[in-house]
Curated annotation (Swiss-Prot):
Belongs to the major facilitator superfamily. Phthalate permease family. Induction: Induced in the presence of D-glucarate or D-galactarate. One of its GO terms (molecular function) is transmembrane transporter activity. Probably involved in the uptake of galactarate and/or D-glucarate. The chain crosses the membrane at residues 19-39, 59-79, 87-107, 108-128, 153-173, 177-197, 253-273, 289-309, 320-340, 348-368, 386-406, 414-434. This is Probable galactarate/D-glucarate transporter GudP. It comes from Bacillus subtilis (strain 168). It comes from the Bacteria.
Amino acid sequence: MKKDFASVTPAGKKTSVRWFIVFMLFLVTSINYADRATLSITGDSVQHDLGLDSVAMGYVFSAFGWAYVIGQLPGGWLLDRFGSKTIIALSIFFWSFFTLLQGAIGFFSAGTAIILLFALRFLVGLSEAPSFPGNGRVVASWFPSSERGTASAFFNSAQYFAIVIFSPLMGWLTHSFGWHSVFVVMGIAGILLAVIWLKTVYEPKKHPKVNEAELAYIEQGGGLISMDDSKSKQETESKWPYIKQLLTNRMLIGVYIAQYCITTLTYFFLTWFPVYLVQARGMSILEAGFVASLPALCGFAGGVLGGIVSDILLKKGRSLTFARKVPIIAGMLLSCSMIVCNYTDSAWLVVVIMSLAFFGKGFGALGWAVVSDTSPKECAGLSGGLFNTFGNIASITTPIIIGYIVNATGSFNGALVFVGANAIAAILSYLLLVGPIKRVVLKKQEQDPDQSLPV
């Protein structure tokens, strides 16, 4: 239903509701990543209380990743079928509820507690699966192409902001009240956020505060403001055959591989980094919680700056390919610096180097902007889910591989080399595989999908 905004907003002057929407995505992503990091902050205490070695801890860390990957395509389908607002709200509620329940595992015997912890981490991962594809859909519908880099980088930078804010808080809670309190506090915070999301977020054409000028600005700039119209939802049942087209597109294959490599860096910082500070650098859990926030602060700054730089390049007439690839490649080059930590005994120099590496990781984390730029209009949620599936295989492999490396060598040196090598692989993927970045146009299903897209 059309609205008359003339009495509320001056003619021709567009509202800025889209920036409130991305702020809400920022809050959701902050809680999302804080809940992922609960176990990494409490990890040393949990490992001690439950009697886990490094390999077993690696598998517990990976429980989230198994479910998160499994849930990506169903989550993407749900987003396309029922819309972003409803599915994201349910996602927030359930991952927060399962986080809350983890606070009770201390009441069980060690053997039972380990099984429950793995199961609850698995359910958190399954519940979080629609979140990032949903974020990508929301940005694609609320933002023109010229602002998507900034918008995507802003909500994506929340993963670092979450560590800056919540790592010290969770470290203090663990130190003062025990590790169980971390899960209780974070679970309650997420449930409250789910309610706020339902009360404040709408589709572009249904938002009570957006005006026609802003809608026109978004749509004329390439925003998909009708993405969640009822007609679009009716068509979602026929989208599954498009998966083959997405999986045979050379550009997308390169983006998927690079995202796996970049996510490897993410999960080192989300899982083993605080443990590394405690076990390899001799810090207390409280110190590690505060120290882990410093690289994360740099990652936050890098994340915001990377998106801004990308959009500035685009507005100055550079191609979309150039504007997206330059920050990604530059950021991954900086991330490789973490390997230098193997050659110093200074804990504070390690923090400085990791801060530089995390800044680079944030600066180059433009994958979701690329997804918004390239996803077919017919299946944006499914495309984002596929992208996140490949990327988050790293959430399974990274904690396990690092666990085996540490267990076999008694050192984190090999682990840092492994993570740094993934940054190099991401660069090579964007340089050699991705090619020009552009929106994928799908062939209709009655045509041969093998000939739909160049590889």
